[in-house]
Swiss-Prot record:
Belongs to the PceB family. The chain crosses the membrane at residues 3-23, 35-55, 64-84. May act as a membrane anchor for the chloroethene reductive dehalogenase VcrA. It is found in: Cell membrane. GO terms for cellular component: plasma membrane. This is Probable chloroethene reductive dehalogenase membrane anchor protein. It is a multi-pass membrane protein. The keyword Transmembrane applies. It comes from Dehalococcoides mccartyi (strain VS). Keywords: Cell membrane, Membrane, Transmembrane, Transmembrane helix. Induction: Cotranscribed with vcrA and vcrC. It comes from the Bacteria. The keyword ATP-binding does not apply.
Amino acid sequence: MDAIYFFLTIALAVGLTMLFTWFKKNNITLKWNEWVLGILGLLLALFAIQHTYASATYEFEYTSAWIVGVIVLLLAVVPLLFAARSVRRRVDK
């Protein structure tokens, strides 16, 4: 197991903990569809990171690593933006 996965797990745990404490502090609740969109975006982002790292490190395919990584990261941003927009619209009311 590479060290990148250890540090990625630590960063993910710290980031999610900070996000949940910020939600509690600002009294923000999420609906079920916002949870689904957030988890989908997070999984796509993790897939992009893992694919880019594995393709570049083990297969030495830098071009395909970056092309697929960028495409999947762009796809990961879409559900996260929809969830953030939905929460912002509800909180502003």
